[in-house]
Amino acid sequence: MREPLEDIQLRSESWKPEEVLRWAFATFGDDVAMATGFGVEGMALIDIASRINPNVQVFTGDTDFLFPETYDLIDRVEKRYGIKIERLYSAVTPEEQEMEHGPELWKRNPDRCCGIRKVEPLKNKLAGLRAWITAIRRDQTSARAYARKIEWDIKFQLVKINPLADWSAPMVWSYIHKHNVPYNPMHDRDYPSIGCTHCTRAVKPGEDSRAGRWAGFQKTECGLHAGNKSARIPLVHLEVPLGVSQSVTADET
């Protein structure tokens, strides 16, 4: 059975995260993996996914500049869920980057720094997959406002799955507390969005939740999530196993 992506997009908008994930695992098998930076949304999604597929593949971009709290959380996730997080590293070491681009590239050209340390490793990883899963929400940034739960990733040329696209921050935190999901303690210290040590600061009262990322630059994204503003792109080669779309059922969250 073959189904255009645009049809799946429309139907999946009414699906709960569990339904979206069941569809993803049934459709792509080992050719789908979850990307996470271990933000609170990512933690909720790891918990949901692990209940459905204990062997879910999870990877993260390790820029060599993450906070100690983030590294500690990765260890806690591996122990709690019994999964091994794949860490994606840049082919360029921090020392090599400094030699080629000068010291503190993130202060002068954060886009270039993100490209070297995050985007290129992700691009290499996604080249071997048919689909990837993210925890982005539409209300996070303008670039994510048009995200669909299932869409074609124009930038990386594969299916992109966003089960939490229509969730709000309160919904995420409600799930975290209800299921006692571990999270980065920096969230309790006014860090709603956490990236690298050099480009993340605490958010001041009244600021946007991502104001602490790349402060001083007109930048809210690292470059991983291109805005699919017209995501109605047919995926003619997507094979959906017969009955999968119709048989998915949601667990209570």
Where are these regions (language model features)?
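Nucleotide-activated chemistry modules centered on ATP-dependent adenylation/adenylyltransferase
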Residues: 1-253
